[in-house]
């Protein structure tokens, strides 16, 4: 069996583990995109440390959960967003203005929608977390 969207599967698994009160989530398969999304989430205080574990296949991320995530998920389809259009997607995916993050893939790498707005960049929506 193959996964159609490993990022959506990983974020759903993290959200479910957080919901039942687990302190650690094991995300597999690991990928560079999932690692970069976890890095943004860690920088903004939604998860604790995470580490890559080699298992001889695709690898596993061990993610420490700290009880800060209410919901997280992947955005499908991955909308192309101009720098002026972030507010429309904030209203769609986040519960309130200034609460939560949209994670955006820009030409300068993965970053939050606020960082992209400040730098005047557009990109593709990857995921949300609040």
UniProtKB/Swiss-Prot annotation:
GO terms for biological process: translation. GO terms for molecular function: rRNA binding; structural constituent of ribosome. The keyword DNA damage does not apply. One of its GO terms (cellular component) is ribosome. Keywords: Ribonucleoprotein, Ribosomal protein, RNA-binding, rRNA-binding. One of the primary rRNA binding proteins, it binds directly to 16S rRNA central domain where it helps coordinate assembly of the platform of the 30S subunit. Part of the 30S ribosomal subunit. Belongs to the universal ribosomal protein uS8 family. This is Small ribosomal subunit protein uS8. It comes from Methanothermococcus thermolithotrophicus (Methanococcus thermolithotrophicus).
């Amino acid at each position: 069996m193959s996964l159609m969207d490993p990022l959506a599967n990983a974020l759903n698994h993290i959200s479910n583990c957080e919901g039942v009160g687990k302190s650690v989530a094991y995300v597999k398969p690991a990928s560079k995109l999932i690692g970069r999304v976890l890095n943004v989430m860690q920088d903004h205080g939604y998860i604790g440390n995470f580490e890559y574990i080699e298992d001889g296949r695709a690898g596993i991320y061990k993610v420490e959960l700290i009880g800060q995530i209410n919901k997280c998920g992947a955005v499908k389809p991955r909308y192309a967003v101009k720098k002026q259009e972030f507010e429309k997607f904030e209203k769609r995916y986040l519960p309130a203005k200034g609460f939560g993050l949209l994670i955006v893939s820009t030409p300068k790498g993965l970053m939050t929608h606020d960082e992209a707005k400040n730098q005047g960049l557009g990109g593709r929506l990857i995921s949300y977390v609040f």
